[in-house]
Design a protein with these regions (language model features):
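Membrane-interface helix-boundary signature
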Residues: 1-11, 46-49, 75-82, 101-104
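Cytosolic, membrane-interface loops and tails of multi-pass inner-membrane proteins
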Residues: 27-49
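Membrane interfacial helix-start motif at the N-side
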Residues: 42-61, 95, 99
């Protein structure tokens, strides 16, 4: 594995790790002070929306599963799966930024876009 491939792999792993944290926030910590702070909500809203947050967390878990699958699968499948799931993360981040909070663009979409550029560069250089 050359340096560009290593960088791409690390960046994809970071995107997956970010989403593991989001899963934990949405499924486990939603009603806690950490969850309230992370999403800028109050206790009453968190209590009412906990089932929706858990559902959203589950979907973020699917993104993690896809990114890990892409990292572990042999090419060309690994490359294709990684590109697909990074694209899903980017779309989710852009949509979240447009509909919920612009910060999502930086937290979710930007790291995935950087990772996608690295993955494509590694594929073109390799």
């Amino acid at each position: 594995m050359d340096a560009v491939e290593i960088v791409a792999t690390v960046l994809v792993a970071i995107v997956a790790a970010i989403h593991v944290y989001i899963v934990i926030l949405e499924m486990v910590l939603w009603r806690t002070p950490r969850g309230l702070q992370a999403f800028g909500t109050d206790q009453a809203f968190a209590d009412r929306s906990a089932p929706l947050a858990a559902n959203q967390g589950l979907y973020n878990g699917f993104l993690v599963a896809g990114l890990v699958w892409g990292l572990l699968a042999a090419d060309p499948i690994g490359f294709q799966v990684t590109v697909f799931f990074l694209g899903c993360v980017i779309v989710a981040g852009v949509f979240g930024a447009a509909t919920v909070n612009r910060r999502i663009l930086v937290v979710q979409a930007l790291p995935a876009a950087i990772a996608l550029v690295a993955v494509l560069a590694a594929a073109n250089l390799g």
